Amino acid sequence: MNNKILEQLEFNKVKELLLPYLKTEQSQEELLELEPMTEAPKIEKSFNEISDMEQIFVEHHSFGIVSLSSISESLKRLELSADLNIQELLAIKKVLQSSSDMIHFYSDLDNVSFQSLDRLFENLEQFPNLQGSFQAINDGGFLEHFASPELERIRRQLTNSERRVRQILQDMLKEKAELLSENLIASRSGRSVLPVKNTYRNRISGVVHDISSSGSTVYIEPRAVVTLNEEITQLRADERHEEGRILHAFSDLLRPHVATIRNNAWILGHLDLVRAKYLFMSDNKATIPKISNDSTLALINVRHPLLSNPVANDLHFDHDLTAIVITGPNTGGKTIMLKTLGLAQLMGQSGLPVLADKGSKIAVFNNIFADIGDEQSIEQSLSTFSSHMTHIVSILNEADHNSLVLFDELGAGTDPQEGASLAMAILEHLRLSHIKTMATTHYPELKAYGIETNFVENASMEFDAETLSPTYRFMQGVPGRSNAFEIASRLGLAPFIVKQAKQMTDSDSDVNRIIEQLEAQTLETRRRLDHIKEVEQENLKFNRAVKKLYNEFSHERDKELEKIYQEAQEIVDMALNESDTILKKLNDKSQLKPHEIIDAKAQIKKLAPQVDLSKNKVLNKAKKIKAARAPRIGDDIIVTSYGQRGTLTSQLKDGRWEAQVGIIKMTLTHDEFTLVRVQEEQKVKNKQINVVKKADSSGPRARLDLRGKRYEEAMQELDHFIDQALLNNMGQVDIIHGIGTGVIREGVTKYLRRHKHVKHFAYAPQNAGGSGATIVTLG
């Protein structure tokens, strides 16, 4: 499509309306390059993406993308084997993190059915190993100590040396206070110095680094810290060298993945642009138009996007209609209507929402041409008419049946009779070539052309004779008429003069009366349509209100049912606990046999109501939330024992996880790390202990293995285990606690010592575990 139309209709200003919604530099670059497309499938794809984004906002109310810098130049430098600085690496780290977040967001999406965006989400790739390594770069663009063991060693020494220097200088501040101009430690050329009064400069031995502008203060590095400062200088040089080595290593890690990272960055930017299109559509009450396959245009309540308070108008350009001729006086809004049509087409063909109502339809043109405004060329010494005619000739040479042509004041700038004839001839040529055209003119001769010629329609802009001002309402099918007599009368021109003027133009009076009747009919039709739209809007509001009330009622009902169930469950749980206590006491007194106790417990449990929770929305949602908190590859974590951040890279067969923490790879169990994004701790699941029943102490005994348990968890399992053993009349059990630090072993001993049903306990023989296991005799 020709670029001149984009300048004429100020399409770049339209694109700037989307800038406030963008978060990434990549999306800004894509918006800058956005131009109208000429292939319907590509336009349809863009519209489908906006519809998909609308689904996300309807279901989840938001779609967050963090601010991302452009990394295109950094990736080019990587391809040229250059090393990146820390700010460039930080920008890439954010892209990797945002990619991982977006993948997780997509995996958690519910109740959405995408047409186009799914392919974008699924083409995103994550790099858990790279993310883990890049945790060594914090959000402030600083390398953390754990980036490498050498860097950690250097910084530890640096901290110690600086602390010693500060301590020495702090002591000197107290001892030499009368010699100092200020009671502080200053810094000159990276060295710690004291501000000494010039008169006492010989009282403190050391190196002079600076003198104040007044000459009253000398900045001296005391001899006591010279060696330490030299050491600090060397350590800082070592630190810079090690940081450079780490940045080189990080750059080498990225090089094999440049193409994939570039693709991820583009996808994130494109998603950001789609998000901006949706937000623009939502804030401006715009719509996604349908695409016609027969050059039909239907714009309902279309508005000019660059006007602050635009008047909405309907415009219908049917398949058979070749030209619309807007006639009438100037300053009525004819040019605005012409530009509104052009911009609606440019926006639609660029994949942008159109400022119109739902049901609007656009066509797909290979080119849009316009001759709008005074384009007189001073350099070419052309008159207004010559300039317009030169441009029109160019348009007629290039336009074809897949073009849209817009003419403003066609034939103006020359003799009215000749200008009108030229305008009609040009329109007739375009009509015979089946080129859709909209033209504005103030020549009355073109009204007759619009009435008498097939596939050509007149139109005009409404004028309020009461206020003597245009309303900017588009009246399709009604030619424009002159309002000169009405305006002259209202402005005080003598009635006899107006009457005489009317008699002089008597031949046109019948035409004006017909036009006046058409205007009245059009206004009446519009009033009826407006009333129908008002009723329709009221019905929509009522429908939304009913749906809202129903949803609120359903939600409250679910809450009440859940509350009732919980209260009932609490009563049942209380009864079961009481029954356990009673049965335990009976068992202690040997009044019941074990199988009778088990039967009795089964009968009591039958008293609990069996509630089908499979359809409970509240519980199902809770289960989904809980399930979503399970660790996944690519999750950011904090290693509990070290307090360092890392990223999960893979899960081993035994359930343990491999994580990348800085440049170190670690193997962790689930309880040795926490997820960074988890907002609430998961409840610990009740664990069941399988107990082997036995009637006496002979044969295999029940065992409880407490190795690897935390202290509180181990004590809870031990208490439950002993209760089960007593309930099942077991005479002897084994408790395996290991040796380790001895904490759990000591806890087991204390527990058994104070339990009234434990007759005897002792460590197992050496061949059966020794001090790592305890044999307990119950009775």
Swiss-Prot record:
Description of how the protein assembles with itself and partners: Homodimer. Binds to stalled ribosomes, contacting rRNA.
Q: Which Pfam families does the protein's record reference?
A: MSSS, MutS_V, Smr
CDD domains according to UniProt: ABC_MutS2
Give the protein's function.
Answer: Endonuclease that is involved in the suppression of homologous recombination and thus may have a key role in the control of bacterial genetic diversity. Acts as a ribosome collision sensor, splitting the ribosome into its 2 subunits. Detects stalled/collided 70S ribosomes which it binds and splits by an ATP-hydrolysis driven conformational change. Acts upstream of the ribosome quality control system (RQC), a ribosome-associated complex that mediates the extraction of incompletely synthesized nascent chains from stalled ribosomes and their subsequent degradation. Probably generates substrates for RQC.
The broad enzyme category this protein falls into is: hydrolase
What is the protein's given name?
A: Endonuclease MutS2
Q: Where does the record place the Smr domain?
A: 704-779
Q: Any S-S bridges, and between which cysteines?
A: none
Highest taxon listed in the record's lineage: Bacteria
Q: Where are the transmembrane segments?
A: none
Cite the InterPro entries for this sequence.
DNA_mismatch_repair_MutS_C, DNA_mismatch_repair_MutS_core, DNA_mismatch_repair_MutS_sf, MSSS, MutS, MutS2, P-loop_NTPase, Smr_dom
Q: Which residues bind ATP?
A: G328, P329, N330, T331, G332, G333, K334, T335
Task: Give the UniProt record's GO annotations in the biological process aspect.
Answer: mismatch repair; negative regulation of DNA recombination; rescue of stalled ribosome
